[in-house]
A protein has these predicted regions:
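A short glycine-rich, Lys/Arg-flanked "PGG" loop and its adjoining helix->strand segment in the class I
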Residues: 213-225
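Conserved SAM/SAH cofactor-binding pocket of Class I
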Residues: 103-187, 193
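Mobile active-site "lid"/loop adjacent to the S-adenosyl-L-methionine
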Residues: 189-214
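N-terminal auxiliary segments of SAM/dcSAM-dependent transferases
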Residues: 2-79
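Conserved small/polar residues in nucleotide/adenosyl-binding loops
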Residues: 237-247
């Protein structure tokens, strides 16, 4: 099978598993507790994902509950980022619905690539704030970081505050670019060109490559003369799924 075929088969298997898990409904009490024998206590995980309990009973799918519990564990323990230096100020704590930087290749690229300037950088799609943190630790004096998702902005703010870098990074809610130009514009977009099937998948899936195309279309209008745009990483899945070799 080609890479594109393998990708679609994997997505089909994921969708089948999701349908099964979505067919199992779990009743929740007004405080998010589960009134079933030997049920786990997932109240904190529910609160982190949905906000404070309202006191009303509700029902959730097993699929959604497993997703938010997994996100809670990542948020609790965090992810060590070697590019941020020595412990303890080198961990990123992802929130529910925000991509966890467990694969650090793209972070390493930002940490190692020569900087065109240390005056200003834009971080498009800030997510957890990991790339903004790396740029600030490398000496960039000011980073303007954007995201359209309030969850991501809250996550980035919490991480940057914990890393003692919030005074160097300005967070803005925006669809792609902030106003103005910068000598460096960095973007790590969702790299899978497919439809997200749950809130947590929006950090990975970009239907129609909307964000990727928007970044490329608007980059020149937001770069200073001689500036650089870093698209990290180039999506192998995107290339394979859309390639049309000519002979």
């Amino acid at each position: 099978a080609t890479a594109a075929e393998a990708f679609h088969l994997h997505r089909q298997a994921q969708a089948q598993r999701a349908r099964v898990l979505a067919s199992v409904l779990i009743p929740l009490e007004g405080d998010y507790s589960i009134a079933l024998r030997r049920a786990p206590d997932w109240r904190q995980a529910c609160t982190e994902a949905w906000g404070p309990a309202t006191g009303e009973r509700s029902v959730a799918t097993l699929r959604e509950l497993l997703g938010l519990v997994g996100a809670h564990e990542w948020r609790k323990k965090g992810v060590e980022i070697p590019a941020l230096g020595a412990p303890p100020l080198n961990r990123i704590h992802p929130h529910y619905g925000v991509f966890s930087p467990v694969r650090g290749e793209y972070v390493g690229l930002v940490a190692a690539a020569p900087l065109p300037s240390k005056a200003l950088a834009f971080d498009i799609g800030v997510g957890t704030g990991v790339l903004s943190a790396v740029l600030a630790r490398r000496g960039v004096q000011r980073v303007v970081a954007t995201d359209q998702d309030p969850r991501a902005l809250a996550c980035a703010r919490e991480n940057l505050q914990r890393l003692q870098l919030l005074d160097r990074v300005e967070l803005q809610q925006a669809d792609l670019f902030p106003p103005g130009r910068a000598p460096l514009v960095v973007c790590n977009p969702p790299w899978v060109p497919a439809r997200a099937n749950s809130p947590i998948e929006h950090a990975v899936y970009d239907e129609g490559s909307r964000m990727l195309k928007g970044f490329l279309a608007g980059l020149s209008a937001h770069l200073e003369p001689g500036g650089e745009g870093w698209l990290i990483p180039v999506s192998y899945t995107h290339l394979r799924a859309h390639e049309t070799p000519e002979h």
